[in-house]
């Protein structure tokens, strides 16, 4: 058995997929690309898949009315989070700026940690994700 995809629920599947496509530079699964402006988007109303290196997939499932996580406050706990590694502190800062431009919000700043500098963000649907320095994993 093997893990095929990590799936994120969200109230706007297309917007969430576009956020991660821009953040990671991944591509849509054939047929999941956005339609031309003004055209209907039936694929973006339910389920979309992004594909990355080595066959990795990140999928998005429409869940109307999803309540975003409030982590680190536990009133609406996270169910999962994504970890992304970069090789240097300079890359960490560049990815921080990139994530904010795309609509992420900062949840935690631990960039002063000498062993593992990191940022914790929330994506536009409220899912927490981390970007941290780990040269051996980047």
Model-inferred region functions:
Residues 1-5, 77-81:
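Short, solvent-exposed beta-strand edge segments and adjacent coil->beta transition regions
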Residues 10-11, 89, 116:
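Short alpha-helix boundary/capping motifs
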Residues 42, 74-77:
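A generic structural micro-feature
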Residues 15-16, 89-94:
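Short, conserved charged micro-motifs
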């Amino acid at each position: 058995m093997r893990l095929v995809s990590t799936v994120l629920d969200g109230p706007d599947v297309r917007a969430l997929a576009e956020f991660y496509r821009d953040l990671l530079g991944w591509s849509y699964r054939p047929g999941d690309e956005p339609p031309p402006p003004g055209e209907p988007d039936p694929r973006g109303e339910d389920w979309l898949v992004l594909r990355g290196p080595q066959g990795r997939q990140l999928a998005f499932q429409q869940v109307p009315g999803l309540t975003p996580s409030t982590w680190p406050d536990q009133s609406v706990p996270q169910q999962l989070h994504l970890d992304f590694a970069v090789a240097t502190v300079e890359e960490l800062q560049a990815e921080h700026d990139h994530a904010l431009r795309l609509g992420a919000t900062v949840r935690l700043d631990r960039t002063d940690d000498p062993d593992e500098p990191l940022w914790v963000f929330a994506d536009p649907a409220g899912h927490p994700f981390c970007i941290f320095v780990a040269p051996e994993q980047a």
